[in-house]
């Protein structure tokens, strides 16, 4: 048995497209391998802002040897029909066929022996076809060819791990050749990582500041938010859709608590939350007892800084302040303008 790892590393994938793309990759791989007669145990897919990963474990190293029955025309059929059957099935001579006597009468039959094929030769054309025909809501051409991807594709890692040995697949998509390595966090640890197996994949990426499992990133964000809630005695307003979105925007999530000027609390909650959630992807914060909004908010950063996030906090506070000044201007103007003159 062997394991297979495929990672497609690209520029940032929009968060809203990641889950659908991951499911498509898994579904296509399963259908293609089943069609090729390659037995695979468990297939899982993972996604992040830059990666689509597929892992197949307990995969057979080769397909089973098979025999395929091909039924031809009746023995009294015209020569053109018989010769057409031979040509379409690459049969050298009618002598290679036997005669089957069934309800339709006597007809020619050819028994083809299909030899076993190695997984390392079956998978490359499958992966190339999946990549070339990948279904994206929106896509762009990249490189010098005609292939399309949601953002430029930068690296393909495709390896089979068997008997403590790593074998790289020979894949070529518009000149982009498959490798046996990936890369760490784009800004924090952008180094080559040679992968030695499934367990090593996740561990090696974590050591290079990438959480490849979307579920693990989600749980990590929740844990960090919970610690902030206890530290500041606040209650972060639950937002599952926002949580799902920000989990797809980062590879190394760092939750930080920031704040805005209290004077903006005079704005309606809906205005504040729209400015924070829709525009900036921030979590709103309420007081534990009163449930009223506070001037604090939670942001999820994709980098870990040496100043404990202070520079990131200040930058985000400036951006939100500008948003809230705009919101206050339009709100005040609407208040001054009566509905009926």
Over which residues does each language-model region extend?
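Function-dense linear segments that define catalytic or interfacial modules
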Residues: 284-341
């Amino acid at each position: 048995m062997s394991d297979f790892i495929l990672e497609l590393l690209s520029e940032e994938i929009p968060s809203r497209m990641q889950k659908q793309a991951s499911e498509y990759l898994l579904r296509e791989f399963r259908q293609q391998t089943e069609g090729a007669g390659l037995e695979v145990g468990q297939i899982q897919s993972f996604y992040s802002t830059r990666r689509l990963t597929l892992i197949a474990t307990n995969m057979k190293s080769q397909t089973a040897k098979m025999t395929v029955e091909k039924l031809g025309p009746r023995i009294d059929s015209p020569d053109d029909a018989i010769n057409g059957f031979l040509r379409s099935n690459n049969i050298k001579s009618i002598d290679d066929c036997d005669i089957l006597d069934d309800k339709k009468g006597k007809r020619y039959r050819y028994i083809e022996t299909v030899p076993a094929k190695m997984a390392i030769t079956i998978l490359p054309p499958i992966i190339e076809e999946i990549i070339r025909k990948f279904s994206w809501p929106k896509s762009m051409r990249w490189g010098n060819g005609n292939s399309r991807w949601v953002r430029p594709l930068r690296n393909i890692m495709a390896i089979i791990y068997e008997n403590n040995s790593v074998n790289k697949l020979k894949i070529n998509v518009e000149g982009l050749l498959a490798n046996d390595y990936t890369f760490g966090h784009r800004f924090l640890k952008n180094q080559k990582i040679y992968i030695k197996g499934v367990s090593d994949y996740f561990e090696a990426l974590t050591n290079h500041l990438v959480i490849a499992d979307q579920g693990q990133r989600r749980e990590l964000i929740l844990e960090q938010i919970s610690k902030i809630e206890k530290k500041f005695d606040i209650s972060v307003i639950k937002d599952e859709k926002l949580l799902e979105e920000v989990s797809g925007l980062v590879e190394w999530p760092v939750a930080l608590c920031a704040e805005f000027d209290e004077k903006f609390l005079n704005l309606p909650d809906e205005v504040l939350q729209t400015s924070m959630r829709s525009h900036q992807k921030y979590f709103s914060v309420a007081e534990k007892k009163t449930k009223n909004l506070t001037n604090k908010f939670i942001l999820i950063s994709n980098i870990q800084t040496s100043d404990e996030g202070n520079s990131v906090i200040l930058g985000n506070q400036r951006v939100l302040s500008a948003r809230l000044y705009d919101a206050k201007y339009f709100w005040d103007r609407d208040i001054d303008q009566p509905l009926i003159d």
